[in-house]
A protein has these predicted regions:
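Hydrophobic faces of well-ordered beta-strands that scaffold small-molecule active sites
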Residues: 3-7, 26-28, 55-59, 91-93, ...
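Glycine-rich beta-to-alpha transition loops that act as phosphate-gripper elements at the mouths
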Residues: 7-12, 58-66, 74, 125-132, ...
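Catalytic cores of alpha/beta
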Residues: 14, 68-73, 132-142, 183-196
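Glycine-enriched alpha-helix->loop->beta-strand junction motifs that scaffold or abut catalytic
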Residues: 22-26, 51-52, 87-89, 141-147, ...
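Glycine-rich phosphate-binding active-site loops on the catalytic face of alpha/beta enzymes
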Residues: 27-34, 93-97, 147-157, 198-214
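Active-site-adjacent beta->alpha loops and helix N-cap segments on the catalytic face
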Residues: 34-50, 98-113, 130-135, 155-168, ...
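Glycine/small-residue-rich loop that forms an oxyanion/phosphate-binding "nest" at active or ligand-binding sites
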Residues: 55-102
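Conserved small/polar residues in nucleotide/adenosyl-binding loops
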Residues: 220-227
Length: 231
């Protein structure tokens, strides 16, 4: 299996940079400062028009956790359909119950929608807050998910590398395991060699100053080093 890095992109510009760097697949988001939200349709359309990247689109209506109100769920399904109609090659999503277990009803419904377009269904790092990784991954396999993005239920994937290895050894022939969080050029090879996975997910981010940001008007809550930066 050919090894690859999926680039986590926060904008059209990020996708172009990834493409110029020979990336083959991106996960397109907005608002990476809060972990990634649903991107604009226009950014997807422009990326598909100008590149041959495989584009997985995040569908996440808000920041924070992954247990949603009914209205938010319906909005995410509408977003997913619109993105798929406009060329998305897959959708990254995650639905949990209040107890942290996978919401099987909404997850199955989303997988079926994505597969009706013959595209990839990717369960994102909501997986990492489930109480039982093995029960969760078996649920995803039973529901038909194609891939799961995971840091091995730790803050960073290298911290969860042993669980990632076990998951790949036990389930890698049934679902793709995609390690993500803290992955970079220095540790990607070690992750692949140790766990047996053939792909990793990395944001490869850099920061760009925006002269219009100020310290007297706050638009969001950012970590200190991002206060004057655009992601």
């Amino acid at each position: 299996m050919e090894r690859m890095i999926e680039v986590c992109a926060g904008s059209y510009q990020d996708c172009i940079a990834a493409y110029q760097g020979s990336a083959k697949r991106v996960e397109l988001n907005s608002a990476l400062s809060v972990g990634g939200l649903t991107p604009s349709v226009a950014s997807l359309v422009r990326v598909k028009k100008e590149t041959d990247l495989t584009v997985i689109c995040m569908v996440r209506v808000r920041a924070a956790g992954f247990c949603y109100e009914k209205e938010d769920v319906e909005i995410m399904f509408e977003d997913a359909k619109i993105l798929l109609d406009h060329g998305a090659d897959g959708i990254a999503f995650g639905f949990l119950n209040e107890d942290g277990t996978i919401c099987e009803e909404d997850t199955k419904r989303m997988i079926d929608l994505i597969h009706s377009y013959n595209k990839e269904a990717v369960f994102h790092r909501a997986f990492d807050v489930t109480p039982d990784a093995f029960e969760a991954i078996e649920t995803l396999i039973d529901l038909g998910a194609d891939r799961v993005l995971t840091s091995g239920q730790k803050a960073k994937a290298m911290e969860g590398i042993d669980l990632i290895k076990v998951l790949n050894n036990q389930y890698g022939d049934k679902i793709q395991i995609l390690p993500g969080s803290g992955m970079n050029a220095e540790n990607a090879k070690m992750m692949m060699n140790y766990t047996g996975v053939y792909q990793v997910h990395s944001s490869c981010k850099s920061y760009k100053a925006d002269a219009t940001t100020t310290k007297t008007v706050s638009y969001t809550h950012l970590r200190a080093h991002e206060t004057d930066s655009y992601l």
